[in-house]
């Protein structure tokens, strides 16, 4: 059986550059950031509770008349506060 020819190897082979991405270390979030997103979630919760318990009905106090006039928009406002706080928790370190 005939023998196959042996190929010559190059003296210098160029290796592919392999870089692994380095994760940047980020420090912990500041105290005000944590207070902000917890505060926003609590504001939304309190808004919803006040609307449900005090601003609805014929016995609503006159101080909360403006809230009763908003009607169903109170749900949107309360959930907007809560969702904003929830979205900020994703940036928390």
Swiss-Prot record:
The chain crosses the membrane at residues 31-51, 70-90. The keyword 4Fe-4S does not apply. It is a multi-pass membrane protein. It is found in: Cell membrane. It comes from the Bacteria. One of its GO terms (biological process) is cell division. Its main location: membrane. Keywords: Cell cycle, Cell division, Cell membrane, Membrane, Transmembrane, Transmembrane helix. Pfam families: CrgA (PF06781). InterPro entries: CrgA. The keyword Cytoplasm does not apply. One of its GO terms (cellular component) is plasma membrane. NCBIfam families: PRK00159.1. Involved in cell division. Belongs to the CrgA family. This is Cell division protein CrgA.
């Amino acid at each position: 059986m005939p023998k196959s020819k042996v190929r010559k190897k190059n003296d210098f082979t160029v290796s592919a550059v392999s870089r692994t991405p380095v994760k940047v270390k980020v420090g912990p979030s500041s105290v005000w950031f944590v207070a902000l997103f917890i505060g926003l979630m609590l504001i939304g919760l309190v808004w919803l509770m006040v609307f449900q318990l005090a601003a609805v009905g014929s016995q609503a106090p006159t101080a909360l008349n403006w809230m009763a006039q908003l009607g169903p928009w109170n749900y949107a406002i309360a959930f907007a506060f809560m969702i904003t706080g929830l979205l900020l928790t994703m940036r928390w370190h």
